[in-house]
């Protein structure tokens, strides 16, 4: 009986630790308000494929038309949280692996040594309905960005 209780406790601890090792709070539809009065908001839809796998698309609506900007995937690979998305090196886009690291309870950074832009992407959960996102670049010819996403 004691053995069963110990095994149950270990399994529950493992599940709890796994949940902390993955930013599943990103799941959902997020709106990125436009800073220009001439364009509409953009959106990021993070769909939970499984407990440790999210898929996302970034897009903007223009009436009945939709313009897709990027597709992203986040999962655990070889013990690391990996964000797969397009990066840029020497003016050429390529599918890059950004390795994630939790800096604090609700702050994650995803870095890719091969990518000039972005070289790092930060996600900071401000509340259940707000996430602050900012990027870093390696090359001064690229632009960094930052914005707040709102859950919709």
Question: Which ranges hold each PLM region?
Answer:
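Sec-dependent signal peptide recognition
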Residues: 2-8
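Central antiparallel beta-sheet cores of small beta-barrel/beta-sandwich binding domains
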Residues: 32-114
